[in-house]
């Protein structure tokens, strides 16, 4: 929406849906189901008409131990499956690979172990939308006596927004990147 507003495109009839909310739009009953992903507040949509049910997941990650947001609800997806789904539209990185992706909680433990053994400056890259990873790195920086800097316009903007809406704690205080060399 920010890009649309920034480009001065008119946004008419916008409907905001909260995670867990159900709404009706014309012939469509839509349930907004919270799912885990590196982007906070990601939701799947269960779209039902009198003739069919479609599940649209967007990108997702099954994570029973997320750092930010609610855990994946296997129960809710089992209930949807029991009701019957006519089509699933989904996208998930590495979904066709065998095995599983570690939870963000497991990633945090691994990062902490690696960074604690390092001397001096540590540089970690991640997607700018990965608010949980920013929170993990801030905690590790504090634990190891380091400072955290968030570099890049997208990452800095995401960190600011996440803090404003309460996804990052007030204690999340990155220093300006130009001060990281001191």
Predicted regions span which residues?
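Single conserved hydrophobic/aromatic residue that forms the stacking wall/gate
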Residues: 1-6, 10-11
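Short gly/pro/ser/thr-enriched loop/turn and capping motifs at secondary-structure boundaries
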Residues: 3, 21, 63, 155-159
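General beta-strand structural signal in soluble alpha/beta enzymes
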Residues: 16, 56, 89-90, 124-125, ...
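Core dinuclear metal-dependent hydrolase active-site scaffold
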Residues: 18-77, 81, 138, 142, ...
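Active-site metal-binding loops of divalent metal-dependent hydrolases
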Residues: 38, 58-60, 92-93, 127, ...
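Gly-rich Lys/Arg/Thr-decorated short loops/hinges at beta-loop-alpha junctions or inter-strand turns
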Residues: 54-58, 85-96, 115-120
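Divalent-metal (often Zn2+) His-rich catalytic cores of metallo-beta-lactamase-fold enzymes
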Residues: 76-82, 86-106
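Hard-cation-handling environments
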Residues: 96-182
